């Protein structure tokens, strides 16, 4: 019954919402506290998931994302792909088909994960996450998103315990988020999702039944086309209102977009945070948007 009521309520909001919401990020979040997630480290600015990429993201004033996997001998590292085909284009086919999980740390640590993007980046390596935690401990104001690919959460919680308050665990798996919060209650979380408005409505209804427990931030993937946005403006306005009523930061990922006007339009709709492959463009668009209020 509660789920049906929520679906009806969100549906009504989507149908009737016309004007932009009265709530605007500029009135509630100082620009210095605006959270931008740099996808896979620094987006397109650097080879992904490297210490160098994370450094660029922090220099821009954003929060880098690390994708976590575990080597054959149990070392948690930052690496996104299921295999090495994209990152090691010059390697032999047998090597390209392998996964992080098939190699030991000694085998992983010598891989050049930067050369595929150009000789300027040659020599960059897969980072061990314990090294990243040491960097975070030295810079208490820095934060890091950690997206779980293949990791034992108990091991992750144990190894990162000194910097739990600087971590934001990101996952599309709600049960995993709840498990992590039991292990690391000081850590923030981000629940990300994409799909049609119907699919998103159903997922939000399910979270509503759980009172959005253990979720700090929620991210919706937004795709732009000639016909408008998917999901649409009215849906995003209604979703933002729902999330704010539960104290959850509303983040959008403008999928593969580097259009400053799209970032600014999403802020008009009540979006209060971004994930992006173009963190430099996003930060400039945000600065310009905040300056419009002066």
Predicted regions and their residues:
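Bacterial N-terminal signal peptides
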Residues: 4-13
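C-terminal active-site rim and adjoining tail of enzyme catalytic domains
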Residues: 20-24, 117-123, 193-194, 198-294
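Metal-dependent phosphodiesterase/phospholipase catalytic core, i.e.
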Residues: 20-25, 34, 80-191, 213-234, ...
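Active-site beta-loop-alpha junctions enriched in small/polar residues
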Residues: 41, 69-73, 81-82, 149-151, ...
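Short, solvent-exposed loop/turn elements at domain surfaces
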Residues: 44-48, 86-88
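Catalytic domains of carbohydrate-active enzymes, especially glycoside hydrolases
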Residues: 53-70, 209-218
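GT-A fold catalytic core of metal-dependent nucleotide-sugar glycosyltransferases
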Residues: 61-85, 89
